[in-house]
């Protein structure tokens, strides 16, 4: 009996020790992220059926699966990140590990198989392109007088259009006017040229841009199941047609630049890329790689410029449209911005970049627009380049990671009443300076894949809005209801079209200040 008791105690001790060792060994071992149900071939598609757009659905799903969870898109493993801590780990702490990009059918059509910056995979080619484009942008630089003149020229032209409409009592759809203004800024940066109203080339550009916005990055089935390309596909056909028009316009600009290029003059971004290509070609005997090896083929030059051109126009234009939409919904905010402009700038000169520090409420309003309606609610997916981890979860090489910026910017634990438009959340208690109340704010991304045009976009948003609001009060015609705040999901989250009534402010010259302050 005694031996049986001793044996029982020994067995219990061994089992307890084994359990303890198992707990110690597994306590810190990363686990798989919680997963939505999935089926062979289909993946989690059946679990993603919803009347809501993806960014809203992904935010709702965290109530069941947690802030970070996984799903299957066909055969692809995808992790959805809804919290700023894991988002910053992807973008900053492990930025190089998560710097990859997925290859999809639609983005390959758009970028000639990834020969651009936004959708291009992480590589020596990508790093070289980014370095060149960054250098060209720095040539103009934040606060640069030349870039300020370009933006103010377009702001003046935009205000002229609003004045003409006001004089005849017309309400305008501002979408094409804002697009033309921003397009001309980017054209000056990329091509050293601009468009006038009604220009046939500009009208063609509007059509192809909208077609691309309507077809790319919609999680279309052909991106999940590439073999579906063999069947007729209206969206894919439209995308190819729009890209063909875009490429024809880019090729025209490219040939014009090559014909009158000079090593002694750098007029714009395309000149900077041509110079880098020629420099690499002339020095390739001493280098370990040729111009082709670092990606400086004509295709790469065109796609890099097209990338900056396309992204720079659509995103900034969309933010401006959202800003105007919210200012119409919140006339008290519009009035407060105008009062700030009256005090700090007056009516005898136009606003300029040096006024930014004196106009904190306008700057806070821009930040709030970027928060409440992030132009890209789902950041372009990242890809893990090696086996790694994310928080407590293991991540295998090749896993796609989607950061849901919408969730970050509407997190109830980080933002008080996140669905309420409130520029004051970005101001100090006395309203005299800007603050950042939460780390859950990444309107331009961060890290290796941060938006290259962040500084330029902020300059444009400030100057366009300050010029308009100094001169006009914006509203909708009495017969029209307030515009929807829901938006249309695509490459960017766009507001719906509506007409805007611009009323000249008493005492302000809706006429024209010099464009070169």
From Swiss-Prot:
Keyword NAD carried by entry: no
One function term, GO molecular function aspect: heme binding
Enzyme Commission number(s) of this protein: 1.14.14.19, 1.14.14.32
Cofactor requirement: heme
Keywords for the protein's UniProt record, in alphabetical order: Heme, Iron, Lipid metabolism, Lyase, Membrane, Metal-binding, Monooxygenase, Oxidoreductase, Steroidogenesis
CDD domains (UniProt xref): CYP17A1
Cellular localisation: Membrane
Biochemical pathway: Lipid metabolism; steroid biosynthesis
UniProt GO cellular component terms: membrane
Catalytic activity: a C21-steroid + reduced [NADPH--hemoprotein reductase] + O2 = a 17alpha-hydroxy-C21-steroid + oxidized [NADPH--hemoprotein reductase] + H2O + H(+); 17alpha-hydroxyprogesterone + reduced [NADPH--hemoprotein reductase] + O2 = androst-4-ene-3,17-dione + acetate + oxidized [NADPH--hemoprotein reductase] + H2O + 2 H(+); 17alpha-hydroxypregnenolone + reduced [NADPH--hemoprotein reductase] + O2 = 3beta-hydroxyandrost-5-en-17-one + acetate + oxidized [NADPH--hemoprotein reductase] + H2O + 2 H(+)
A biological process from GO: progesterone metabolic process
Binding site for heme: 451
Keyword Iron annotated: yes
Source domain of life: Eukaryota
Function recorded in the entry: Conversion of pregnenolone and progesterone to their 17-alpha-hydroxylated products and subsequently to dehydroepiandrosterone (DHEA) and androstenedione. Catalyzes both the 17-alpha-hydroxylation and the 17,20-lyase reaction.
Family the entry assigns: Belongs to the cytochrome P450 family.
Protein name: Steroid 17-alpha-hydroxylase/17,20 lyase
